[in-house]
Amino acid sequence: MENTENSVDSKSIKSLEPKIIHGSKSVDSGISLDNSYKMDYPEMGLCIIINNKNFHKSTGMASRSGTDVDAANLRETFINLKYGVRNKNDLTREEIVELMRNVSKEDHSKRSSFVCVLLSHGEEGIIFGTNGPLDLKKITSFFRGDCCRSLTGKPKLFIIQACRGTELDCGIEADSGVEDDMACHKIPVEADFLYAYSTAPGYYSWRNSKDGSWFIQSLCAMLKQYADKLEFMHILTRVNRKVATEFESFSLDATFHAKKQIPCIVSMLTKELYFYH
């Protein structure tokens, strides 16, 4: 890879306190007892790509060079997977909330799944609108089982390219379905979410000014190669390995030079996810 300088997607900010949510809802349909999600609805689903590159001067946050490469790569990748892709650029935190609220109110009954990609600066539990921070939980809560009924029991994938802190990883040398007939099931409202983070909790996330972020480059490459062959968690494991072994930061600042990164998968999926059927 060409030695263009790498940047990180971070802006220091006090973390928000997590909220505790109780309760669950019964669902009337769309739940399969098979081991894999039903992906043969008339539509694969929506893929919302929020690409925040330029930030208000008052935030003190730098422009995210290379992010447009990520957005274009993601668009091509998910169109090839038959998703309806909607790209949104430079949204404020209020605009992000409004967009997510409106999308959650759409009828997803003929859609197999939902994907949301967030490209921005971040901290642990935080994504940045162009004018300031937004709690990730605020975004994802619109799609909980008790809030977005037409996506209940369907996979909801959130892909997040952003920093989760300010730690640096120096690295270490190493040797080398079918729906059932039951009328009602009760499932947790937080079930069927998957969060694919670009980096581990507390760490910087790297982005190349020319080629885009390490994580999104790798995710798109692995989806293009394996989406018609492997289950999604297996694909993400290959993404982890690619990022961990094939990338190392290049920076004119010695503090940020020769650093490593490992993505992080947080899954509440209840079945296997295949993009083919």
From Swiss-Prot:
Residue(s) carrying N-acetylmethionine: M1
Regulation: Inhibited by BIRC6; following inhibition of BIRC6-caspase binding by DIABLO/SMAC, BIRC6 is subjected to caspase cleavage, leading to an increase in active caspases.
SMART domains listed in its UniProt record: CASc (SM00115)
Residues of the propeptide: 1-9, 10-28
Top-level taxonomic group: Eukaryota
A GO term for molecular function: endopeptidase activity
Annotated catalytic residues: H121, C163
Listed PROSITE patterns: CASPASE_CYS (PS01122), CASPASE_HIS (PS01121), CASPASE_P10 (PS50207), CASPASE_P20 (PS50208)
Matching Gene3D superfamilies: 3.40.50.1460, Caspase-like
Residues the record lists as N6-acetyllysine modifications: K11
Keywords: Acetylation, Apoptosis, Cytoplasm, Hydrolase, Phosphoprotein, Protease, S-nitrosylation, Thiol protease, Ubl conjugation, Zymogen
Record's subcellular location: Cytoplasm
CDD domains the record matches: CASc
Main location as per UniProt: cytoplasm
Modification after translation (UniProt): Cleavage by granzyme B, caspase-6, caspase-8 and caspase-10 generates the two active subunits. Additional processing of the propeptides is likely due to the autocatalytic activity of the activated protease. Active heterodimers between the small subunit of caspase-7 protease and the large subunit of caspase-3 also occur and vice versa. S-nitrosylated on its catalytic site cysteine in unstimulated cell lines and denitrosylated upon activation of the Fas apoptotic pathway, associated with an increase in intracellular caspase activity. Fas therefore activates caspase-3 not only by inducing the cleavage of the caspase zymogen to its active subunits, but also by stimulating the denitrosylation of its active site thiol.
Reaction(s) the record says it catalyses: Strict requirement for an Asp residue at positions P1 and P4. It has a preferred cleavage sequence of Asp-Xaa-Xaa-Asp-|- with a hydrophobic amino-acid residue at P2 and a hydrophilic amino-acid residue at P3, although Val or Ala are also accepted at this position
Phosphoserine carried by residues: S26
One GO location term (cellular component): death-inducing signaling complex
Role of this protein: Involved in the activation cascade of caspases responsible for apoptosis execution. At the onset of apoptosis, it proteolytically cleaves poly(ADP-ribose) polymerase PARP1 at a '216-Asp-|-Gly-217' bond. Cleaves and activates sterol regulatory element binding proteins (SREBPs) between the basic helix-loop-helix leucine zipper domain and the membrane attachment domain. Cleaves and activates caspase-6, -7 and -9 (CASP6, CASP7 and CASP9, respectively). Cleaves and inactivates interleukin-18 (IL18). Triggers cell adhesion in sympathetic neurons through RET cleavage.
Protein name as catalogued: Caspase-3
Native species: Macaca fascicularis
Taxonomy of the source species: Eukaryota, Metazoa, Chordata, Craniata, Vertebrata
